[in-house]
């Protein structure tokens, strides 16, 4: 047996069954039976021991589980002291507790289909035990104390490794049925074991020197009587009393089955009510999702209004500051000009006398220099003529030598260049062949590795999923709004406006909560897509070659939803209208109800609500656009989708140019204009991280690593989210 093992976690259905059975056992007027079978238990829960001890249960049914031991830690066998029937068959028990003899009133013990290798010696203390079933275990011998079971009627030791019976079994005079593997027995001999229970008992009594009496001469206590401890030697009416006992037990078990069936019906009714409640909860959850978008739009409008007020105030302050700076600049310029003029006048007066003196000195110095230069010039020309003649001869000789060296070097270089070019061509050809071989090898490896193909298919599936794309776009929009709110909050802190600061904080908290919810929805959608991938993998043929490559190609060649709807008969202008209003998720509803532009022009907002369009602003905008389209005699150029636009109709669309304030877009533009702000820690890089749960965007990726609290609000950081600025 392994020293360490992982406990199996029960399934949801098994957990519900356990809770239901425990509740039944604790109800007022419940019977003496505790049934926790088929609950996938790895150990008996503490609550079951407490229930048996407090409510004095007499029957404990724990079959068909994963038990490896009867007693878990911190539990005592004395809690089951009132148990008369203990059913433990179809488990994984390897041994029974050594103090099993403490269950003095136990009458039925069933441990069939387990892994028992031995029985405890204390089993002989179960003086009221009448049925012992150890079938299909790994027992090799029986303890001698088995002969002390004075009330034992039925003993089943078949499908074990037992070859010898203890002689003490002859003292069990009440044994009526003994089941064993007769051919595998050594003692008693196989022919004796095959003759039946009476023959085995006669053989053991003869070996022990006892007289054999049939079990019908001994009267056993009834199962439900608590006072009897030993057998009583009385020949008065044993058969009739035994039949009455059997009938009484049959009646009790039939009543138990009826009550069990009644409880099962009650359980089904409870599950039906639970399912109804879950449906109502799903409807409420859907309504909450619609309210989220409305809240987001309201927050955005309020933020826009606040930004306009702030920008107006900022413009006033900038104008005043600029006016003041102009005045200061003019004053400084006038003062500087006056000082400059004074300095210039003073300087001219000082230098007037110095200039005259310096001019005279310069004239004298120049005359001296000119006289010296004339003499040196005459001497220098003689030397230059001699040097020029010598240089001419030297250069003519050098030029001939250089020309000869150049010719020889040019010839050698030409030869080397030819040989090196040929060698380089060979190397290039070899490198190109190696690259081609590596490329072919990589392509064949990618085609053969199903794991890489599966990962590529999963990535493409997530990329093309409409719901996942809409959640990503909403998360991107909220990140942009949080970045703008953080910048706005930093600016307003410098102005010390507490009322506006509180309003921005409330908006930021609302956006951060909405961002957390969208992250959960994104993770849930990814799990759903992963589940779909697992189903595909389970249904796929294991020997099919390139299965994931084929699935990837199918998904890649799959037409967009808008193109499918157009091929099915939906008008292109209607598809383009819904895509322009960022309502492409309503395309299946319009296609299902076969709605055209003519029908749409005659519909009211209430009719659209019945179809499934819940946003009031979007209803009015769709109806208005449809009427405008029908009023135009021909199709406008902007409503004619090109081929590439049809293929990309379900990509995140840009927002329409003219939308009423009541229209709520379901997806942000394809390219968000992400504002930039500097990190409040290093003041150098841009802020790239969103802190949850506060929602501030104030740090770069490098500075946020050691932080545990937000630098702006000092809130605990539970999660960090990276913002990727779109170029």
Swiss-Prot record:
SUPFAM superfamilies for the chain? L domain-like (SSF52058), RING/U-box (SSF57850), SAM/Pointed domain (SSF47769)
Q: Which Pfam families match?
A: LRR_8, SAM_2, zf-C3HC4_3
User: From the record, which residues define motif PTAP motif 1?
Assistant: 653-656
Q: Which CDD domains match?
A: RING-HC_LRSAM1, SAM_TAL
Write out the tissue specificity statement of the associated record: Widely expressed.
For this UniProt entry, what is the primary localization, expressed as one broad class? Answer: cytoplasm
Q: Name one GO molecular function term.
A: ubiquitin-protein transferase activity
Task: Tell me the compartments it is located in.
Answer: Cytoplasm
Tell me which SMART domains the record gives: LRR_BAC, LRR_TYP
Motif PTAP motif 2 covers 665-668
Cellular component terms, GO, for this chain's entry?
cytoplasm; cytosol; membrane
Keyword annotations from UniProtKB, A to Z: Autophagy, Coiled coil, Cytoplasm, Leucine-rich repeat, Metal-binding, Phosphoprotein, Protein transport, Repeat, Transferase, Transport, Ubl conjugation, Ubl conjugation pathway, Zinc, Zinc-finger
Positions of the LRR repeats?
Answer: 30-51, 56-77, 82-103, 105-126, 128-150, 151-172
PTM annotation: Ubiquitination promoted by PHF23 leads to proteasomal degradation.
Q: Which residues form a coiled coil?
A: 241-382, 469-547
Sequence segments annotated as region (Disordered): 227-248
Under InterPro entries, the record lists:
Leu-rich_rpt (IPR001611), Leu-rich_rpt_typical-subtyp (IPR003591), LRR_dom_sf (IPR032675), LRR_domain-containing (IPR050216), SAM (IPR001660), SAM/pointed_sf (IPR013761), Znf_RING (IPR001841), Znf_RING/FYVE/PHD (IPR013083)
User: SAM domain: which residues?
Assistant: 569-632
Q: Name one GO biological process term.
A: protein autoubiquitination
Q: What does this protein do?
A: E3 ubiquitin-protein ligase that mediates monoubiquitination of TSG101 at multiple sites, leading to inactivate the ability of TSG101 to sort endocytic (EGF receptors) and exocytic (viral proteins) cargos. Bacterial recognition protein that defends the cytoplasm from invasive pathogens. Localizes to several intracellular bacterial pathogens and generates the bacteria-associated ubiquitin signal leading to autophagy-mediated intracellular bacteria degradation (xenophagy).
Q: How does it assemble?
A: Interacts with TSG101. Interacts with PHF23. Interacts with FUS.
Q: What's the name of the protein?
A: E3 ubiquitin-protein ligase LRSAM1
């Amino acid at each position: 047996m392994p020293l360490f093992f992982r406990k199996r976690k029960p399934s949801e259905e098994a957990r519900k069954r356990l809770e239901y059975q425990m509740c039944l056992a604790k109800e007022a007027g419940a019977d003496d039976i505790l049934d926790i079978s088929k609950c996938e238990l790895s150990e008996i829960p503490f609550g079951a021991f407490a229930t048996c001890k407090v409510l004095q249960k007499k029957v404990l049914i724990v079959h068909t589980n994963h038990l490896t031991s009867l007693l878990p830690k911190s539990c005592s066998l004395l809690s089951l002291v009132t148990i008369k029937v203990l059913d433990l068959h179809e488990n994984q028990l390897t041994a029974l507790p050594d103090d099993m003899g403490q269950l003095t009133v136990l009458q039925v013990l069933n441990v069939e289909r387990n892994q028992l290798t031995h029985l405890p010696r204390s089993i002989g203390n179960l003086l009221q035990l009448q049925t012992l079933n150890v079938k299909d275990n790994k027992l090799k011998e029986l303890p001698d104390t088995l002969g002390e079971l004075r009330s034992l009627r039925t003993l089943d030791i078949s499908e074990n490794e037992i070859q010898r019976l203890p002689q003490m079994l002859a003292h069990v005079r009440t044994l009526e049925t003994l089941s064993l593997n007769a051919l595998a027995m050594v003692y008693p001999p196989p022919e004796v074991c095959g003759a039946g229970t009476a023959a085995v008992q006669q053989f053991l009594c003869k070996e022990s020197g006892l007289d054999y009496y049939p079990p019908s001469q001994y009267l056993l206590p009834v199962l439900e009587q608590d006072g009897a401890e030993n057998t009583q030697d009385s020949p008065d009416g044993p058969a009739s009393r035994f039949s009455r006992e059997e009938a009484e037990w049959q009646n009790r078990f039939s009543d138990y089955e009826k009550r069990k069936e009644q409880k099962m019906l009650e359980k089904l009714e409870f599950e039906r009510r639970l399912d109804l409640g879950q449906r109502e909860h799903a409807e409420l959850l859907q309504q909450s999702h619609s309210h989220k978008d409305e809240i987001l739009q309201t927050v955005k409008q309020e933020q826009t209004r606040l930004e306009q007020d702030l920008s107006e105030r900022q413009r006033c302050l900038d104008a005043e500051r600029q006016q003041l700076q102009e005045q200061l600049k003019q004053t400084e310029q006038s003062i500087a000009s006056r000082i400059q003029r004074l300095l210039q006048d003073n300087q001219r007066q000082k230098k007037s006398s110095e200039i005259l003196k310096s001019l005279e000195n310069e004239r004298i110095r120049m005359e001296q220099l000119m006289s010296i230069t004339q003499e040196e010039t005459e001497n220098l020309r003689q030397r230059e003529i001699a040097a020029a003649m010598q240089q001419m001869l030297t250069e003519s000789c050098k030029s001939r030598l250089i020309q000869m060296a150049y010719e020889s070097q040019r010839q050698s270089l030409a030869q080397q260049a030819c040989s090196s070019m040929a060698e380089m061509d060979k190397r290039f050809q070899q490198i190109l062949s190696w690259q081609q071989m590596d490329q072919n090898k990589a392509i064949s490896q990618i085609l053969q590795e199903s794991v890489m193909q599966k990962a590529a298919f999963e990535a493409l599936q997530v990329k093309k999923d409409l719901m996942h794309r809409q959640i990503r776009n909403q998360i991107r929009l909220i990140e942009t709004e949080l970045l703008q709110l953080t910048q706005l909050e930093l600016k307003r802190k410098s102005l010390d406006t507490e009322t506006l600061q509180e309003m921005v904080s409330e908006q930021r908290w609302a956006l951060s909560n909405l961002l957390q919810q969208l992250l959960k929805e994104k993770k849930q959608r990814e799990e759903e897509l992963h589940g779909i991938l697992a189903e595909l993998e389970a249904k796929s043929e294991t020997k099919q070659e390139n299965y994931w490559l084929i699935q990837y190609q199918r998904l890649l060649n799959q037409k967009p939803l808008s193109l499918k709807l157009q091929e099915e008969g939906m008008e292109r202008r209607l598809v383009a209208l819904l895509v322009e209003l960022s309502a492409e998720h309503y395309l299946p509803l319009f296609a299902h109800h076969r709605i055209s532009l003519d029908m749409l022009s005659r519909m009211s907002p209430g009719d659209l609500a019945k179809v499934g369009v819940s946003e009031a602003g979007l209803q009015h905008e769709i109806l208005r656009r449809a009427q405008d389209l029908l009023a135009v005699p021909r199709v406008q150029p902007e409503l004619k989708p090109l081929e590439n636009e049809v293929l990309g109709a379900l990509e995140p669309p840009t927002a329409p140019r003219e939308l009423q304030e009541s229209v709520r877009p379901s997806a942000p533009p394809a390219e968000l204009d992400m504002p930039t702000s500097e990190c409040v820690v290093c003041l150098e890089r841009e802020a790239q991280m969103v802190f949850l749960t506060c929602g501030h965007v104030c740090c770069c990726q490098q500075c946020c690593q050691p932080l545990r609290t937000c630098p702006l609000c000092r809130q605990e950081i539970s999660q960090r989210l990276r913002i990727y600025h779109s170029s």
